Amino acid sequence: MSNNGSSPLVLWYNQLGMNDVDRVGGKNASLGEMITNLSGMGVSVPNGFATTADAFNQFLDQSGVNQRIYALLDETDIDDVSALAKAGAQIRQWIIDTPFQSELENAIRDAYDLLSADDAEASFAVRSSATAEDMPDASFAGQQETFLNVQGFDAVLVAVKHVFASLFNDRAISYRVHQGYDHRGVALSAGVQRMVRSDLASSGVMFSIDTESGFDQVVFITSAWGLGEMVVQGAVNPDEFYVHKPTLAAGRPAIVRRTMGSKKIRMVYAPTQEHGKQVRIEDVPQEQRDIFSLSNEEVQELAKQAVQIEKHYGRPMDIEWAKDGHTGKLFIVQARPETVRSRGQVMERYTLHAQGQIIAEGRAIGHRIGAGPVKVIHDISEMNRIEPGDVLVTDMTDPDWEPIMKKASAIVTNRGGRTCHAAIIARELGIPAVVGCGDATDRIQENQNVTVSCAEGDTGYVYAELLDFSVKSSSVGDMPDLPLKVMMNVGNPDRAFDFACLPNEGVGLARLEFIINRMIGVHPRALLEFDDQEPGLQNEIRELMKGYDSPREFYVGRLTEGIATLGAAFYPKRVIVRLSDFKSNEYANLVGGERYEPEEENPMLGFRGAGRYVSESFRDCFALECEAMKRVRNDMGLTNVEVMVPFVRTVAQAKAVVEELERQGLKRGENGLKIIMMCEIPSNALLAEQFLEYFDGFSIGSNDMTQLALGLDRDSGVVSELFDERNDAVKALLSMAIRAAKKQGKYVGICGQGPSDHEDFAAWLMEEGIDSLSLNPDTVVQTWLGLAELKK
């Protein structure tokens, strides 16, 4: 296995570590590092061997092909797509036509014989590992080849030759030039690894960090049926899971969010060993598309392995995993540094100032917005049609397209998930991308002007016109001390990890309405009485609740995930979750809701808040919210989550709702539970001391308080100019509430819009002695710094 005592041509993974990157590249060095150091810590990596950089360089040198390669590259204009394609094809053919020296062929044969000794029909993965690949400043993102289900020595030898040639793929040549790498300084190592039979199970990619926000307290896992190449390439829309690291470390259920992907196709073994045809793609049966491709226990097991790998490397990691269909065992097949977040973070906020017609939606990559004319590209041969500033719309953006991706103002694809190669490249280039839209190439027209927004959460939108947007950059260090806490209003769990990276002291208002509306979408009564619904409605609900065991579990489970995401994002800081405050017309708009909601002239003043919770017609629906709260606090241990009750009209209602919460297992003081009341009706301030007997504090809702104090409909344009939280009557009521809470030593904050809109109002509240301001995320830094200036 060595070259007559000189530098080895082949090395086993258990002989390798991260100090061998220059010999076997980042990918193979990392596999060796894990086998050597993490095998005893629950991290399983299939065995294998690697050809060395010396083997590659000797192969090029002794054959003389290297001189032809570098001469051709030196005279080729890399930015000329056609010239690049012609040169790349010529170089790859030269390498494939060049025979291996006998020493290298024999070294590979010896290693292969040992690796396959226990199973003559074993199959192997043959992967590339470039000596500059997977360094923290160079995300080569699959620019070299991988060959799967390679059986027999001759097939392995052919695959190694093609791996060597792949160092000169068009995308790899282009990438090296634009990243400043010298072609002569990069070599290739081929890794030969025993295959995990994930063609019979599932596989995917995971990150030990949230890829979009850089939030480092979660593991993000993607999964689909079959071999992992489909997820990596972006050919399928995979299942997604978020696992909260502190909850996992505490030994509790730690999955805070699950999203089911369509998983329409999978890659499996093919019956032939003809090179390049050892795998095939097939449709996934509908019954498998409609279930998650990993169990909750498997998700948590993978997350534990990710945490161990991250801990060992001391940095966020990008990890490929596979489940063996024969044994059910989970394996790690690759691990590399996560590249994008390591580059440092400038706080950059993109804001869309208008809404337009949505023509496509999918998974948002990044948080930026791009706009421009559309180019619908159906085939790589059309690459030269892309001009700088175009929006690239295609079925899936293979990494071969990297030379043109950097020209685009945005990228939109039919297929792909947030861990595919295209998503990684888009993040690295700082280009917004919306992937997995399904039918974008049909719905978006050539040369149509569109706006692509990734600034609205996990879902990215393509709008049918050029919309106004802005970007605000700021550099934030340590924030100055204030006599109050600056908290945040958050409704969309999709944005929670992003917002948690802003300066904050917790969440003063987490709304359930977004979760119920967008993540569930069905009236709770329609789920509780599912069997009584008409067949058409039942089918609509079944489509929404895929992956959940029952209609009730769908509601409670989705609500639990939404609340847990908010609680985990800001853990261990305080997160005050307001129970649902839909009005009857809003509940009626949910699927199945019209049947159960009254027609009201003014729903704003009707059947809402605490009165709804204790009514006979809604009590068992309210129990579902309480069940979700209990799971988050008691099962998952996210006791930083507190409960807030909205729209409590009378003291008797206050007493009744607290008793109902206790009946549902949410007893004030038990397991540290605090119950806060929204102070948003004049009666709440006028009788503040009586209301506070039943609660642990107030959160002032200045929006409702203003409209009720001044007799305004805040949704009416006719009287909107009179709506002002700074009105003396409103301020008098707020002062009463603040003083009453202070007198009893209880918490008092504000979560209404006022302090976000009016810095002078925020300053007045600070002088009044309020404990916290809960602001819109986009005003947190500005208001915080502004108040600090006033205190000087």
Show which residues each predicted segment covers:
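Small/polar (Gly/Ser/Thr/Ala-rich) solvent-exposed segments
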Residues: 214, 450, 704
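Conserved metal-phosphate-binding beta-hairpin within the catalytic cores
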Residues: 142, 314-339
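Conserved catalytic alpha/beta cores of large enzymes that bind or transform nucleotide phosphates
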Residues: 218-318, 323-324, 363-370, 388, ...
